[in-house]
Every structure is written in structure tokens, then in C-alpha cells.
Amino acid sequence: MKSARRRSRELATQGLYQWLLSGSPAGEIDAQLRGAQGYDKADHEHLDAILHGVIRDSEALSADLAPCLDRPIDQLSPVERAVLLVAAYELKNHIDIPYRVVINEAVELAKTFGGADGYKYVNGVLDKLSAKLRVDETQAAARKQ
């Protein structure tokens, strides 16, 4: 059974995918997501934070991701881009969620919605990004190994 947080990440990824392709306003995407399958079992507060936060902060999040990518962000598939934006937002704004959980959730989203090996790319990018955004946490984890 999927957790409410996982459902919120799935819906946010779907909404951001739509936003990346259509450029629709956040309010319109939000309204459509409220009718989506699984919405009733999602963490609505987390979904709203991710969806609206990523759209609001997309330029800054893209700038954070850029040094970790092997190509310009606009050349990524919309699915990979949406997944990476969700994870970047969580790494930056939800310090209560361990970085390994953020990466694992993003990998699962990439497996669910992305291409065959997209999850490997997402994992590599987020390893680099977490080392930048969560320095103390990633260094402490490295010392434990």
C-alpha cells in the first residue's frame, strides 16, 4: 500500500509534467489534480507544498540542478525533469525528510513514470545534488560507512 506522501509525490510529478508541457497556471493544474485517481489518499498539504513550491521556485531549482546534469535541463525528458524538480524541492525545503528517502522516492517515481533507465540518471543527479544541498547529512552518512 502506498503512503499518503508517496501519492502526493506521484500527483505532484503528474501535475508538474503537465505544467512543463502546457504551461498551464498552477491553480488550473491543482484543480485537475483534485479530481485525479488517488487524490483522496494523498497528503494534500505536502502535494500543495510541492506543486506550488516547484512552480514558484522552478528557476532557482533548475539552477541548483544544472551543475549536476550532463546536458541543459530543458533537454531532459519532461518526466525526468518533473521528478528531479520534486526531489530538488524536497531536498532544499523539507529538511525533515532524510536525503536518502528523497532520492529513493524520486527513483521510484522515475521507475513508475519514466523510461527504462531514467531512474539511474535521476539517482546519479540526486546523489550529486544532495552532496551540495545537504552537506552535513551526506558527510555524516559517508563517515558511518
Curated annotation (Swiss-Prot):
Signal peptide: none annotated. The keyword Transcription applies. SUPFAM superfamilies: NusB-like. One of its GO terms (molecular function) is RNA binding. The keyword Endoplasmic reticulum does not apply. GO terms for cellular component: cytosol. NCBIfam families: nusB. This is Transcription antitermination protein NusB. It comes from Paraburkholderia phymatum (strain DSM 17167 / CIP 108236 / LMG 21445 / STM815) (Burkholderia phymatum).
